[in-house]
Amino acid sequence: MGCQEAFRTTLLEPFSLKKDEAAKVKSFKDSVSYIEEALGVYFTEVEKQWKLFNTEKSWSPVGLEDAKLPKEAYRFKLTWILKRIFKLRCLQVFLYYFLIVYTSGNVDLISRFLFPVVMFFIMTRDFQNMGMIVLSVKMEHKMQFLSTIINEQESGANGWDEIAKKMNRYLFEKKVWNNEEFFYDGLDCEWFFSCFFYRLLSLKKTMWFASLNVELWPYVKEAQSVVTSL
C-alpha cells in the first residue's frame, strides 16, 4: 500500500464519514485539528490537479468518428461478455480437455460434470470485471471519466454513447484496458457512473468493492447535475 492510499484509508475516508464534530472528537480525540489541517492541504492539491487536468491537460480523442461501440459489433451483450471470458487460448485448452474427458470410457459421471464447472472458473480468473477495474484505476483516470461526462455536448442516449466511445478509447490508450471495448454501450457507461461514483456518494458508506472517491465528491456532484440533463 502506497503512502497516499494509506492516508486515504486511515484518515481521509474515516474522517470524512463522521457525521459531526462530536463523532470526530470521539474517534480521533486531540488529533482532529491536525487532521483537518492535513486534509485542507490535500484537498487544495486535488483541486489544483482537477483544474489543470480539466483545462491544460485536457485529453481529446483523435479519429473518434470511426470508433464503434461493442453493441454495434455484437448482436447480443452476452456474446460480448463470453468473448471476454472465453479467450482464444482458454477456449483451446477447454476444448482439448473436453475432448479427452468425454471420449474416455474410464471417466465417471461426476468427473464429467465437474470438469466444465472447474474449467469455467479457471477461465473466469482472467475476466476483468468492472468492480476490479475501479479498484486499480488511477485518480487521473477517474477525473477523466468525470470530466468527459461534465463536458459532453450530446444529450440523451446519444450523449452516453459518446461518453462510452471516448472512455473506451482513453482506457485503451492509457493501457488500462486491452482494447476499445470496456463499455458495451451508453447504458453500460451510465450504470458504471451510477454504481461506482454517484451511488457511493449517496450512501457515504465504505464498500469492499470500490473506493469512496472522497476527493472527487464535488466533481461527482457536478457530473450528476449534468447527467440529469442528458
From Swiss-Prot:
| InterPro entries with a match to the protein in the record | DUP/COS
- On the tree of life, the source organism's domain of life is Eukaryota
Give the chief site where it resides: membrane
Q: What are the TM regions of this chain, as residue ranges?
A: 93-115
Keywords in alphabetical order, please.
Membrane, Transmembrane, Transmembrane helix
Specify one Pfam family: DUP
Any one annotated GO CC term: membrane
Q: Which family does it belong to?
A: Belongs to the DUP/COS family.
Official protein name in the record: Putative uncharacterized protein YIR043C
Q: Which organism is it from?
A: Saccharomyces cerevisiae (strain ATCC 204508 / S288c) (Baker's yeast)
Phylogenetic lineage: Eukaryota, Fungi, Dikarya, Ascomycota, Saccharomycotina
